[in-house]
């Protein structure tokens, strides 16, 4: 038995992967997204693959595709998967089309999206969640999960009927009493997104270059200082505790390979979503990553100049399409 129909608001990499897995498990799924993505799915369906699972296909006939929230939509659950900059607009569209009290799960990057969605759509029940894994669009209609992990969401009784559904679909969901620490733990790891995007390399190749790791370590150092000042203890989501991450990242590569073997359980296809954004000339979510660190630092009387520099670099990227080598990026961050 399914808990009901699902509407994915924002059919990008996360939305298509999670929504596609649910559809493959028999859940009625509507994907709301842009023509670039939906046209490819309409023509050839979805192809879903993962580092730890065989690839499988979801025919277009198993999905409902829409450019906007259908007027007759009445989902039991909405997965909000739009980019951070589109959160308020998407939430308002949902509120205008869906019954009051509709359950919305924010599967978005950053810290503040669920609050922003709630403010824009107070009639809806919005809960924050965290996506631990990397999903890349390998080709039109083809989405690949390149790392492992389990979804986490704010604990709420309304989500209990969905736990077996997500488990059966191969995208297991855990409920957590306090999600802020988990969200910050994920954001620390996501600080690698801009480094990876500017490198132009697959994730694993980038992490095996010490210069890029030094850049990431410097960004995490600033974030940890801000978190300490704010009294926030980030959850450990990697094999290494958050506070030790910068030290491990700065190790020589031969030693890093040994110490961080679990961290390197990334297949050759994996890359950051921000790299996909740059490749398509789209505005990135840098404000939800490094921008969040800058704001937390400022709110606690600190500065985060290297995170601010990353925001500046990514904000002008369409005008500067060159990739940055590790030494170049280190110089730009004054390392």
Task: Describe every region a protein language model picked out.
Residues 4, 27, 102, 124-125, ...:
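A structural micro-motif
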Residues 5-6, 78, 104, 151:
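Conserved hydrophobic helix-helix packing surfaces used for dimerization/oligomerization
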């Amino acid at each position: 038995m399914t808990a009901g129909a699902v509407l994915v608001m924002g059919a990008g990499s996360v939305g298509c992967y999670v929504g596609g897995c649910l559809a493959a498990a028999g859940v009625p799924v509507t994907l709301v997204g842009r023509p670039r993505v939906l046209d490819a799915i309409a023509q050839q369906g979805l192809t879903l693959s993962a580092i730890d699972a065989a690839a499988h296909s979801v025919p277009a006939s198993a999905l409902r595709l829409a450019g906007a929230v259908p007027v007759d939509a009445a989902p039991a659950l909405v997965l909000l998967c739009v980019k951070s900059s589109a959160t308020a607009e998407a939430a308002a569209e949902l509120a205008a089309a869906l019954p009051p009290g509709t359950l919305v799960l924010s599967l978005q990057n950053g810290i503040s999206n669920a609050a922003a969605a709630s403010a824009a759509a107070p009639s809806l029940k919005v809960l924050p969640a965290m996506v631990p894994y990397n999903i890349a669009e390998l080709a039109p209609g083809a989405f690949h999960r390149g790392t492992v992990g389990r979804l986490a969401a704010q604990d709420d009784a309304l989500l209990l009927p969905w736990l077996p559904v997500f488990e059966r679909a191969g995208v297991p969901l855990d409920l957590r009493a306090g999600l802020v620490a988990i969200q910050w733990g994920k954001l620390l790891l996501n600080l690698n997104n801009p480094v990876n995007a500017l490198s132009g390399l697959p994730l694993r190749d980038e992490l095996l270059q010490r210069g890029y790791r030094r850049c990431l370590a410097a960004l995490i150092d600033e974030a940890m200082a801000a978190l300490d000042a704010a009294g926030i203890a980030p959850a450990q989501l990697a094999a290494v505790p958050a506070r030790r991450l910068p030290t491990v990242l700065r190790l020589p590569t031969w030693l890093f390979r040994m110490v961080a073997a679990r961290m390197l359980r990334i297949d050759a296809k994996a890359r950051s979503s921000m790299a996909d954004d740059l490749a398509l000339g789209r505005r990135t979510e840098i404000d939800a990553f490094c921008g969040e660190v800058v704001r937390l630092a400022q709110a606690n009387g600190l500065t985060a100049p290297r995170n601010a520099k990353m925001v500046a670099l990514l904000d002008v990227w369409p005008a500067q399409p060159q990739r940055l080598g590790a030494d170049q990026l280190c110089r730009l961050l004054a390392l």
